[in-house]
Amino acid sequence: RTFSSAASDVYKRQSQYDDAVKIAKAAAEATVVGYPNEDGTKIGPISNITKYEKVKRLIDLGVEEGAKLVTGGSELPDGFEKGFFVKPTIFSDVTNDMTIAREEIFGPVLSILKYETEDEAVEIANDTPYGLAGYVQSGNPERAKQVANKIRAGQISINGGRSRGPSAPFGGFKTSGNGREHGMLGLHECLETKAIIGN
């Protein structure tokens, strides 16, 4: 499940869970936070104070609700005394009833949830009021397509596919909005249709 079109939740089988947490932790800790004009920066500041305060509040709420803070947190990254910068943050031991698994965060925060069966993963993915985008990763492309078809989101990327061509529509399901941008569907969203009826 994603908010904006960046992943905010990752679902891993119980048998792969610990390895996934270690990989995510290493990736987050290697990610450089800084000013966009500086070489090496991978994540810049949050766009405004309202969004920044929301991200910090949700990180703190994740801890309060019992998720394990693997790395990151709501304090400024090392080397920053001001600005809307957020450390890349990873949570494990997240359950789908926690706020960080259910809300749009729009910040560098990743929650890792466990599942046992494919059907359970789909159920978790769909148990949200949002549905903008999602991702499916699998060594079996046909199976990945089957899972993608079960997820209620406006865009599903399979095996890292991130590039939408100009003809591919983009937009969400549920409270992530209706209507589409891009492609013919996006063009039709900008048109006004008129019917003229005469004898």
Give the residues covered by each predicted segment.
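Charge-dense, low-complexity intrinsically disordered segments
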Residues: 1, 45-49, 181
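Single conserved hydrophobic/aromatic residue that forms the stacking wall/gate
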Residues: 1-7, 11
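Small-residue (primarily alanine) positions within well-ordered alpha-helices
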Residues: 6-7, 67, 125, 144
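Conserved C-terminal structural/oligomerization subdomain of aldehyde/semialdehyde dehydrogenase
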Residues: 78, 82-199
